[in-house]
UniProtKB/Swiss-Prot annotation:
Induction comment from the UniProt entry of this chain: Alpha-1-AGP is synthesized in the liver, the synthesis being controlled by glucocorticoids, interleukin-1 and interleukin-6, it increases 5- to 50-fold upon inflammation.
Pfam families hit by this protein: Lipocalin
Covalent S-S links between cysteines: 91-183
First and last residue of the signal peptide: 1-18
Annotated organism of origin: Rattus norvegicus (Rat)
General function of this protein: Functions as a transport protein in the blood stream. Binds various ligands in the interior of its beta-barrel domain. Appears to function in modulating the activity of the immune system during the acute-phase reaction.
Any one Gene Ontology molecular-function term assigned to this protein's record: small molecule binding
PANTHER family registered for this protein in UniProt: ALPHA-1-ACID GLYCOPROTEIN, ALPHA-1-ACID GLYCOPROTEIN 1
InterPro entries attached to this UniProt entry: A1A_glycop, Calycin, Lipocln_cytosolic_FA-bd_dom
Protein name: Alpha-1-acid glycoprotein
Length: 205
């Protein structure tokens, strides 16, 4: 699910601490290091997600595409999130900050008086990461992000296997369709406009 939206929607449910054995091949609680944060500092593409809760499913289905930029602050343990999401054939921009809980291996976001957590699962070899939600609860969920919008058969298989490992079915996965992206061209035009504006400003005496 989209990074910003999933953390907002999850304010409806508390994150349950892992009291049961973790699902096979999914390791939670790996500490987040400076190296991890530097690796996360990049442009990311939301590829898809699987959620059991009906509210989450509905939210996932509204997202046509999404990409975002993560800019970590190693001193304050926060991450700046700039998100470009295509919904209803319209580009929507979101900006927020995420908290980093290094020892627990989680990211968090404040939604009012509630702090929502998600376990970070990094797959550096494949240039991807996942966010795990409520894996010990019936309303569990898993979302998938990559550095490129092209979902190769290998990456698709990796996420499908991860979904099965957490006790869900492949049929519950909703992948995005990047042919419906409305933000990339809009952002490109905006950047070109900003460059032209800067040039004109420099010309002025």
């Amino acid at each position: 699910m989209a990074l910003h939206m999933v953390l907002v929607v999850l304010s409806l449910l508390p994150l349950l601490e892992a009291q049961n054995p973790e699902p096979a091949n999914i390791t939670l609680g790996i500490p987040i290091t400076n190296e991890t944060l530097k690796w996360l500092s990049d442009k990311w593409f939301y590829m898809g997600a699987a959620f059991r809760d009906p509210v989450f499913k509905q939210a996932v289905q509204t997202i046509q595409t999404e990409y975002f930029y993560l800019t970590p602050n190693l001193i304050n343990d926060t991450i700046e999130l700039r998100e470009f999401q295509t919904t209803d054939d319209q580009c929507v921009y979101n900006f927020t900050h995420l908290g980093v809980q290094r020892e627990n291996g989680t990211l968090s976001k404040c939604a009012g008086a509630v702090k929502i957590f998600a376990h970070l699962i990094v797959l550096k070899k494949h240039g991807t990461f996942m966010l795990a939600f409520n894996l010990t609860d019936e309303n569990r969920g898993l979302s998938f992000y990559a550095k490129k919008p092209d979902l190769s058969p290998e990456l698709r298989k990796i996420f499908q296997q991860a979904v099965k490992d957490v006790g869900m079915d492949e049929s519950e996965i909703v992948f995005v369709d990047w042919t419906k992206d409305k933000c990339s061209e809009q952002q490109k035009q905006q950047l070109e406009l900003e460059k032209e504006t800067k040039k004109e400003t420099k010309k002025d005496p």
